[in-house]
């Protein structure tokens, strides 16, 4: 801290002292609240006095406290603002300001964004853009530095973030640590590149990502330095991570829903646990909610409300070293939410820095990041090796199963979006798609184009439609576009108001339903079918990857997919 900033901090703190002692009037008084204190598990009546954007004091009702402005809580519950400790804002399909407009009314006041989607497309400039866009969003947007760009040696996106750039990014204001270390095979096999990135992160927080890792391998992974994991899907996996000293991030998003399965562990009141959404789409944010919906599920599942609130407030704040967030207590930032009850968690109002929260209205430009499938796309056919197994797609999960060759019902094509002209195809089962094509430009993590479709003509038409839009989501049938959602920010995000973006996405989903698709969230599920660090089979432009064996399957004798 510089001398000037220390002097400024001292001035703020000294005013808080004067206001707390009643020597000066505060800026805001929230009178007649029931304060939720997750640090002690209590709920108690108090008036909350705010000055300089921070809590000055919690005082007993009726003590004649002075403030420039008073908000009557009338017995409403006052909880700390909710903090999502691990989220990819891009998965909402919204820019940070539009994302804020969707989640501030749900009580979310801060997020730790992991922008490896934008960084895979744009490089380090994508991280800088996310932090800058976050400043004007109305939310407190912190960042973590992507550790795996590309996610594995089998992916090739728009950028490579080496250890030197990771170290540079870790010094950026607003960055809290190293993001999910997804390349766990590289960690376990002592690969130089993975360990150079770990070297850059030592001394700070290192997020983990260890899907399916167990036993001695999990012990080894934890010994390498990661501090957390959000990939547990069973109580046994969750307890094993806690016993290994890892913080447990319980994930509940649009593609992976693990909260119900892990509730038995949360009822055991583990000290080092939190709730995260990871990836959640705009339509789900508006219809179901954000962290508020996870709190509803926790309380319905038997947790005490204060214990549930701790999972989205003081616990994630402690994990990330945000010492002035996560509690309604003297000296803490006055980020809090007024709730009608502690069962439905209906939000009455949200405050950030002691004022009613408002989302920003402007997004900085993000040039580049379009879609270029290359000249060969115009005549491409999408052949599948006869020996390749079928990728079994699972609703509400980002893992896939393995089916016998020849048992699939819809073809998946993944094509390089950066002009290299590479593509591959495999058969899938479980999507229900019987014709036409659903295409996206947001295939994790390199964000290539993924097309789930029938005829070669529809697959090609869907890809060309994405090129024309600069990226997005599109449904094609009979060579014609039936519905689309352009995502002009890096081919990942829209700056439409959340309600409008959600309506367009719902139209896309409805159009996919007409083609037979049965996936509850087809765009989100499709977006994970290329993530090369999640078992069991994933498709890249270079071929079908057996994640467990950590190798691309050989391209042998081919059989042509649907003609046309």
From Swiss-Prot:
Its EC number is 3.5.4.2. Keywords: Hydrolase, Manganese. Its cofactor is Mn(2+). GO terms for biological process: adenine catabolic process. One of its GO terms (molecular function) is adenine deaminase activity. The keyword Manganese applies. This is Adenine deaminase. It comes from Deinococcus geothermalis (strain DSM 11300 / CIP 105573 / AG-3a).
């Amino acid at each position: 801290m510089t001398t000037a900033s220390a002097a400024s901090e001292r001035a703020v703190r000294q005013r808080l002292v004067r206001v707390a002692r009643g020597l000066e009037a505060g800026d805001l008084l929230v009178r007649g609240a029931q304060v939720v204190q997750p640090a002690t598990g209590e709920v108690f009546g108090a008036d909350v006095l705010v000055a300089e954007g921070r809590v000055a004091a919690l005082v007993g009702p009726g003590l004649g406290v002075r403030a420039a402005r008073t908000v009557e809580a009338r017995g409403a519950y006052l909880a700390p603002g909710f903090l999502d400790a691990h989220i990819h804002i891009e998965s909402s399909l919204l820019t940070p300001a539009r994302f804020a407009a969707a989640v501030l009314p749900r009580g979310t006041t801060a997020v730790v964004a992991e922008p490896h989607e934008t960084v895979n497309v744009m490089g380090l400039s994508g991280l800088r853009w996310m932090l800058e866009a976050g400043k004007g969003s109305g939310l407190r947007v912190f960042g973590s530095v992507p550790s795996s760009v590309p996610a594995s040696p089998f992916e090739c996106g728009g950028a490579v973030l080496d250890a030197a750039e990771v170290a540079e990014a870790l010094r950026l204001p607003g960055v809290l640590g190293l993001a999910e270390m997804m390349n766990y095979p590289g960690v376990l096999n002592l690969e130089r590149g993975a360990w150079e990135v770990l070297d850059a992160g030592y001394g700070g927080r290192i997020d983990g990502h260890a899907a399916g890792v167990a036993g001695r391998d999990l012990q080894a992974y934890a010994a390498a330095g990661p501090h957390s994991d959000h990939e547990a899907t069973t109580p046994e996996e969750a307890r094993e991570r806690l016993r290994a000293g890892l913080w447990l991030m319980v994930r509940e998003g649009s593609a992976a829903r693990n909260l119900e399965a892990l509730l038995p562990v949360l009822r055991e009141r583990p000290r080092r646990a939190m709730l995260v959404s990871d990836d959640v789409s705009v339509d789900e944010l508006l219809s179901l909610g954000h962290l508020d919906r996870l709190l509803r599920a926790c309380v319905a599942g038997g947790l005490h409300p204060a214990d549930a609130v701790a999972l989205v407030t003081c616990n994630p704040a402690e994990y990330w070293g945000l010492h002035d967030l996560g509690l309604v207590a003297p000296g803490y930032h006055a980020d809090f939410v007024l709730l009608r009850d502690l069962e439905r968690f209906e939000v009455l109002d949200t405050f950030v820095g002691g004022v009613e929260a408002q989302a920003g209205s402007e997004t900085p430009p993000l040039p580049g990041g379009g879609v270029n499938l290359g000249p060969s796309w115009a005549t491409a056919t999408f052949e599948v090796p006869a020996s390749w197994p079928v990728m079994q797609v699972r609703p509400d999960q980002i893992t896939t199963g393995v089916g016998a060759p020849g048992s699939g019902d819809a073809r998946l094509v993944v094509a390089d979006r950066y002009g290299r002209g590479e593509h591959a195809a495999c058969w899938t089962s479980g999507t229900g798609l019987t014709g036409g094509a659903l295409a996206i430009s947001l295939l994790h993590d390199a964000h290539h184009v993924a097309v789930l479709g029938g005829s070669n003509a529809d697959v090609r038409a869907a890809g060309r439609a994405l090129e024309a839009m600069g990226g997005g989501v599109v449904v094609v049938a009979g060579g014609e576009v039936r519905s689309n959602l352009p995502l002009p920010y890096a081919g990942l995000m829209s700056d439409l108001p959340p309600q409008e973006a959600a309506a367009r996405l719902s139209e896309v989903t409805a159009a996919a339903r007409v083609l037979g698709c049965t996936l509850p969230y087809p765009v989100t599920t499709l977006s994970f079918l290329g993530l090369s660090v999640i078992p069991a089979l994933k498709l890249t432009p270079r071929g079908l990857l057996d994640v467990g064996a950590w190798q691309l399957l050989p391209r042998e004798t081919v059989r042509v997919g649907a003609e046309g």
